[in-house]
Amino acid sequence: MSVEQNIINKICFFYDEIYLLHKPIDWHTERPERLISILTALEERVDLKDNINFLKPDKANEEDLLSVHSESHVKNIMTKKSGYLDPDTYISEHSLEAALFAAGALKRAVDEVKERKLKYVFCAVRPPGHHATKDRAMGFCLFNNAAIGARYAQ
């Protein structure tokens, strides 16, 4: 089996430690421990170790965000330092950086799949990104990573 075929058949797991720095101001359901539990479970699964390829995400840029979000929403998130954006969604010191790498993971996953380098992809990102709308953060999500990835794939 060639190296290329070997990579394609692995589960490619996009992850970066920056995701753990997106921390709530107080106790919150969406917290680093959610991702830590996934990583711990993967470490314990000896049968999976040879089938997972850990990859680092790229960082999304403002143009990527603007492909699905309004300028006012992007600027609001980029200038907010700390606090709650709604009852469910918080932002803290490293949240913006984590969110940019979360969106970037989706872009890189799209590239890898389109170029037929990867077949199976899992983006273990924080903050999550599928509830945010064009104009606002919500449901724990600052940006809509799923929409950014889909738009990028077009």
Question: Which positions does each model-derived feature cover?
Answer:
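HDAC/HDAC-like amidohydrolase catalytic core signature
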Residues: M1-Q154
